[in-house]
Structure formats: C-alpha cells, structure tokens
UniProtKB/Swiss-Prot annotation:
Its EC number is 2.4.1.-. The chain crosses the membrane at residues 40-60, 80-100, 117-137, 201-221, 235-255, 259-279, 321-341, 367-387, 408-428, 441-461, 473-493, 502-522, 527-547. Residues 569-591 are annotated as: Disordered. GO terms for molecular function: glycosyltransferase activity. It comes from Mycobacterium tuberculosis (strain ATCC 25618 / H37Rv). This is Alpha-(1->6)-mannopyranosyltransferase Rv1459c. The keyword Transmembrane applies. GO terms for cellular component: membrane. Its main location: membrane. It is a multi-pass membrane protein.
Length: 591
C-alpha cells in the first residue's frame, strides 16, 4: 500500500476528494457582503465596457462610435481608456476572489445567486466592442470566404476577399494570408451569420457574441452536473470554472470560439456518461448487446424456483432500453461537433471510449471493440458534417496554422527562444527555428504519451474520466506549441468539476489572476510602451485606494461567524453527499 501511494496515478487521483455537496445557508452579514461583492464586480465590468470604447479591438471601418460625441470620447483619450479597462478587470478579478469565500466555505451561496452574479457581470460586456483580441474579425473574414464559394482552408482573407474588403481591413496583418485553422462546424455557423448580416461588422460581431453566450450557457449547464457526478459541490465548481475571470475577459469580452467548443464538449461528456450510467452496459456478446440491463440480469439470474429454460425463454423477448443508447449517441455527437469547432476537445471522446470499454470488461478485446465503434461513429459524424457544410476534411491541412505565433506562455516555445538567444550571444548563430521545431516535437510526443497513459489509468479504474480528461487537457495546454491566456480554461473548467484539493484550487486561482491581470492589455498592439506603463501604474493606485475605502464594507478579510446558528443551518451541517453514480468501485483511488 505504501508503494502504491508513490505511483503517478495515485498522485493525480489524490487531487480529488468528495466534499460537502450543499453548504449551510449564508448568514445575514454574509448576504450583505455578497451583495456588495456582486456590485463591486459589476462596477468593474461596466468600467471594462466603457474603456473598451477606446481601448478595445474596434473595427477599422464601420466603427459605430466614430463621430458620436460622447461615445467617441474614449478613443481620444486612449491611456485613460486603457486605465479604465485595466482597473475594471482587476476589480472584477478581486470580486471573483472574494466571491470564493461564499462558495468554498462551510456556508455557501445558492446556485441561483451564483448564476445571477455571473449574468450580471457579463451583461455590460455583451454590447461592448471586442477586447483583448481581434480574432473575431478573422472569423468574419473566413466565414465570408466560405459564403463567396471559396475554400477557407486554401485561401486567406487577403487573397480570398481582397485587401480592401471591409472584413480584411480589421484582420491583423499576421493572419491576412493564412487559411482558417477552425473546424467546419464553426465556419458553417459563421457562413450562416455572414448570410444573415452581410458586410455589417457590428451585427456580425454581435451574432458571434450570441454564439459565445450559447457556449457559456452550455458550460454553466454541464459543469455543476459533472461536479455532482464527481461528488463536488456545484457552486464550488461553477465559481472556479464558469465564473472564472478568464472566461469573462476572453470568451465573453474577447469573443473566442472556445466557449462553444467547451460547452459542446462538457455537455456531450455529461450526456455520454449519463447514458453509460443508465445502462450499466454489460460486456457485449451476440446474446446481450441489444438487451436492456434488467433483461440481462433476469436472464442471468432466473427467479427462485424457475428453471433455466424458463429464464432463457423470458430473455428471448426482451424489451430494449433505447434511452441509454440515445444518451450515449447524443453525447458522442456533441463531443464530435465540439471537435469540429476546435480539435483538442476530441480528447473527450477517448475518455468516453475507455469508460465504455471498462463497462464491457476492461480488457484489450473490449478496448479494441469500443475504440472501433466510437471511431467509426466519430468519422461518420465528421464525414456527414463535412459533406453538409461543403468543407470536407480540409481543416486537417491547416491545424498548424497558429504555429507561426511564438507564444511566451508555451514552455517548449519559451525554451527554444531562450536557447536561440543564448546561441546568438555566444556567437553560434541564430538557430531558434531549428530548436523550435525540436522542442515543439518533443512537447507533442510527451502529450501523446501522457494522454495514452491517462486513458489506460481510466480503463483500469484508477482515475475518474472527468479527472483524466482535465489532466489530459492540462498537459496539452502546458506543452502546446502555442498557448493563449484563454487556453487555460480548457483544463480549469473540467478540473473544477473534479479536483477539490486546496493545492489545485490555489494553483488555479494564481494562474487565473496572473494571466488575467498581468497578461494581455485590452488591445496591446495599439499602445505604446509608455501608455501601458502609465495605465498600469494608475490602475494600481486606483485599486489600492478602492481597497482602502472598502476595507470595512467588503469581505477582504474572513467574516466573523455569527453566534446564532439558524435551524436551517444546523439541519444542513451534514447533508448527504451524492457519490459518483458511474461504477464507484471503478474509481476508488479518486475518492
């Protein structure tokens, strides 16, 4: 047993521990502090939205604020606008941090209060200009290329639309000649938006933000259900995952298609695991793979006094249970669709496949059979989608498009850049490109090995599939050739539904705050260094003053517990925690 505790699978599984599913209700003092915290965060997002009028990624043409006296003012005082945006983002992040006091403690806020808080914080950003990124303009250009009958996987905005096109003008120069790196589902949706809005940039941007809102809604729906499946408190998972500042800043304000990818993936995983739980799928055989679990149990265990022949005769006329199969099929379809937005979410299909193989016996034969079935289903869905959209499988050839970016957040890329600079200093020449290809290849190899090992751990019942998926995505993000701030959400959101140890949550919080606050500016490529420095210094002073002014009114410190405990609180001190319903014996190391 002591040796077992030193295994890697045990170390990963130890990140999870069942926690109290429902906390005691908040006291009057805590409810007041919660309301003030909610207002503090909402004020921050309002400041972000106002500052975005000058510091956001506004379009080059068709800017609706141009010439409007009040709305055009922020664009004339860009340093002030950047200060407002930065200050608002810090206020929202600090409010989120204080909100954690009401989601991780013994007394917790209700799910409804957390949902309303998230909605309140997002509302100002839904009508604000894009922030932190201009990717949405690439979405518009690539979708317009498809609407014009060209292949967005072969031509970029400049060659497909022309340099003077209204969409191309707003696309960053780095991406004007590159084909689309996104899946056919996303480009198909974008083509529909282009058909609906034409060349109206504002309407098209708002439609893409609506798509993001749909994705966020799916995330909010799926995350607490996955958390409940893993024995984790719903509000804890939602706070760390769906209410994460990175989601608000980059997916909502920045309009990134990761929202749709994650929403479809998480919803698909929940549906698939629910179907497998409902069926308790037995090992497949010609006699049993079309029977419902009740019929199979009856055929294997005839009633007392009944002859084996009688039990067999009852199994001849089974009543199939199509519900579990439909849920598994729906989940698999949603996961595959998510991969047709961005490919990394296809990892979820691997973990659903291993759970299915575990249900079928957990041996090599079961794994090969489950892999063949799920791979065939996945390829069929991709083929149908490629045929329906007219885009085929061209996306395979553009998967490496983003590798032209040299991201300092990617350890393989950072290592190569550092090595290249050392070589230059030593007079050995600039070998950065060669080293970059080597370090990135090693990173991809490590990702492949780790994902295969995690799949094997789930197959053997040593790791919960949600935990395996989250860790696999974390490894993928860590060693990916290109890492953007919002990529951290690939791992944080699924892990928030499974990992409960303080070490993980502290690491996730620190990563969120460091990347969210000290990462990008609202539109860094438009600002001079002195503007960024001035705005950062001014924001720091303003935030310090705000903390000083609200120190006694906001929960900057832990609130003193009230002496009187309500009857409702006493009754809810030891609620029954729902254990994972999917073969709990399979994940004994995760509890």
């Amino acid at each position: 047993m002591a040796a077992r505790h030193h295994t890697l699978s045990w170390s990963i599984a130890s990140l999870h521990g069942d926690e109290q599913a429902v906390g005691a209700p908040l006291t009057t003092t805590e409810l007041t502090a919660l309301a003030r915290t909610r207002l503090f965060g909402a004020t921050g997002t309002v400041l972000m939205a106002i500052g975005a009028l000058g510091a956001g990624a506004r379009p080059v043409v068709q800017d609706p604020t141009f010439g409007v006296r009040l709305l055009n003012l922020p664009s004339r005082i860009q340093t002030v606008s950047l200060t407002m945006t930065t200050t608002g983002a810090v206020m929202m992040a600090l409010a989120w941090l204080m909100l954690g006091r009401f989601t991780l403690g013994r007394r917790r806020m209700s799910r409804g209060k957390l949902d309303r808080t998230l909605l309140l914080w997002m509302l100002p950003l839904l009508i604000a200009p894009p922030m932190y990124s201009k990717d949405v303009y690439s979405y518009l250009a690539q979708s317009e290329i498809g609407r014009d009958g060209l292949d967005p996987y072969r031509v970029g905005p400049a060659s497909g639309l022309g340099l003077g096109h209204v969409f191309t003008l707003s696309v960053p120069s780095l991406w004007r000649e590159t084909p689309a790196p996104y899946g056919p589902l996303f480009l198909w949706i974008g083509r529909g938006i282009s058909s609906l809005t034409g060349e109206n940039i504002v309407a098209a941007v708002l439609c893409h933000r609506l798509v993001v809102l749909i994705g966020v809604t799916l995330i909010v729906w799926a995350t607490p259900r996955l958390a409940q499946r893993c024995g984790v408190a719903e509000v804890s998972a939602l706070w760390l995952g769906a209410a994460n500042p990175l989601l608000i800043m980059h997916l909502v304000a920045g309009i990134h298609n990761e929202a749709l990818m994650l929403g479809l993936m998480l919803t698909g995983v929940e549906f698939a695991l629910r179907g497998l739980d409902m069926a308790n799928t037995p090992r497949p055989s010609p006699e049993t793979w079309r029977l419902g679990p009740a019929t199979i149990r009856a055929s294997r265990r005839p009633e007392l006094g009944a002859s084996p022949r009688a039990g067999a005769s009852r199994a001849v006329k089974p009543r199939p249970e199509w519900g579990p199969l439909a849920m598994l099929l729906a989940g698999s379809i949603l996961i595959t669709l998510s991969s047709q937005v961005k490919l990394p979410s296809l990892l979820a299909m691997g973990f659903v496949t291993t759970v299915l193989a575990y249900r079928w016996g957990g041996n090599l034969r079961a794994l090969l059979l489950a892999a063949a079935v799920m791979a065939s289903l996945t390829l069929a869905i991709m083929a149908i989608l490629g045929w329906a959209s007219g885009l085929g499988f061209g996306w395979i050839n553009t998967l490496g498009t983003a590798n032209v970016v040299r991201s300092w957040m990617s350890p393989p890329t950072l290592l190569a850049l550092g090595t290249g600079h050392v070589g230059i200093l030593l007079g050995l020449g600039d070998h950065t490109t060669a080293v970059l290809s080597l370090t990135r290849a090693i990173g991809v190899l490590i990702i492949t090995v780790m994902v295969c090992w995690l799949l094997l751990a789930v197959l053997r019942g040593r790791l919960h599939p949600i935990g395996g998926l989250g860790v696999a995505l974390a490894v993928t993000v860590l060693l990916f050739p290109v890492v953007q701030p919002w990529y951290l959400l690939w791992a944080i959101i699924p892990l928030a539904a499974w990992a409960t140890r303080p070490g993980f949550r502290v690491a996730a919080i620190l990563a969120t705050l460091i990347v969210g606050i000290f990462g990008p500016t609202a539109n860094g490529d438009r600002f001079a260094l002195f503007q960024i420095v001035d705005a950062t210094a001014a924001s720091a002073i303003i935030v310090i003053l705000l903390i000083a002014l609200t120190y006694t009114r906001l929960p900057w410190r832990p609130l003193a517990a009230e002496q009187v405990v309500t009857a409702a609180e006493s009754a809810s001190k030891t609620p029954a925690t729902r254990r994972p319903t999917a073969a709990p014996d399979a994940y004994a190391d995760s509890t």
